[in-house]
């Protein structure tokens, strides 16, 4: 009775119709916030992504090569202009440099990449820290917040983020993510020890731009550690916020442990997908061999 708003996410970039949820909220006078953090493009059933909610939120940096930027939108209500502070000139320049550094790291700027690599290597020497384990285990809240600068919430996005959002084409992003998802699906349709989190069929992503391919693994820990050690584009939600309540029927803890998320990013090509998928299959096969006794 005290509920004023409900937040409903489209997980993994695989948007679903929110028709029943929308009706449930309307019947009770509850505002629906459509969480599109994983899902920037496509259809969610009868409506476009972001059009079910009274408000919708999205994360641009998950789909575009941006240093930052989130989105608040509404297909039904007016949104007052936010009075955001302009970032400092230093922050603006750093944002531009960060974009160039990331592009150089992923084989962009072919002609001048050696020069850029040397420059960024020198730049980063001062900020290098001792390595940490690739597998994160139950950090305290203060540690988890180190990568989250909440002092920025009153500041406008950087020039670099807004310029790239406006200039970059959408078609290639959508198509390559669909291709990558479909490629993963060919590997994991019938595998011992793992299965797609959701049923996959020919039209699963025909109207979507997938964020990841969610793969349920029965015994994930050793496999995940090996994949992370190989620096493959795979992750899972293994950071659960301290004091998160344990709610009946909540599948979040199970997913955070068992669901490996195989990235479908548009800059991953078929060879990248094949390499990652085959590594997963090899680890699964090795695991199964160790678990099952040999016949004599």
Features from the language model and the residues they span:
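Active-site phosphate-binding strand-loop segment of PLP-dependent enzymes
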Residues: 1-84, 89-90, 265
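PLP-dependent aminotransferase class I/II
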Residues: 7-9, 80-296
């Amino acid at each position: 009775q005290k509920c004023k708003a409900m937040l409903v996410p489209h997980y993994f970039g695989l948007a679903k119709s929110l028709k029943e949820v929308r009706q449930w909220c309307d019947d009770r006078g509850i505002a629906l916030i459509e969480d599109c953090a994983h899902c920037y493009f496509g259809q969610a059933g009868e409506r476009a992504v972001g059009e079910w909610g009274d408000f919708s939120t999205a994360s641009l940096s998950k789909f575009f090569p941006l240093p930052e930027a989130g989105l608040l939108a509404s297909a039904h209500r007016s949104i007052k202009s936010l009075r955001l502070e302009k970032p400092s000139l230093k922050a603006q320049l750093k944002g531009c440099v960060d974009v160039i550094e990331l592009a150089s790291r992923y084989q962009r700027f072919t002609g001048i990449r050696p020069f850029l690599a040397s420059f960024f290597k020198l730049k980063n020497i001062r900020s290098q820290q001792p390595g940490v384990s690739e597998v994160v285990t139950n950090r305290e809240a203060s540690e988890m917040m180190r990568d989250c600068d909440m002092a920025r919430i009153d500041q406008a996005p950087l020039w670099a983020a807004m310029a790239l959002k406006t200039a970059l084409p959408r078609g290639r992003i959508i198509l390559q993510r669909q291709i990558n998802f479909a490629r993963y699906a060919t590997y994991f349709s019938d595998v011992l020890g793992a299965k797609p989190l959701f049923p996959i069929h020919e039209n699963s992503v025909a109207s979507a731009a997938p964020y990841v391919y969610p793969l349920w693994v029965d015994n994930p820990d050793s496999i995940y550690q090996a994949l992370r050690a190989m620096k493959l584009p795979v992750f899972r939600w293994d950071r659960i916020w301290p004091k998160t309540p344990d709610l009946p029927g909540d599948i979040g803890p199970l997913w955070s442990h068992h669901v490996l998320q195989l990235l479908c990013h548009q800059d991953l090509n078929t060879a990248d997908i094949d390499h990652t998928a085959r590594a997963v299959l090899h680890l699964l096969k090795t695991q199964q061999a160790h678990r099952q006794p040999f016949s004599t």
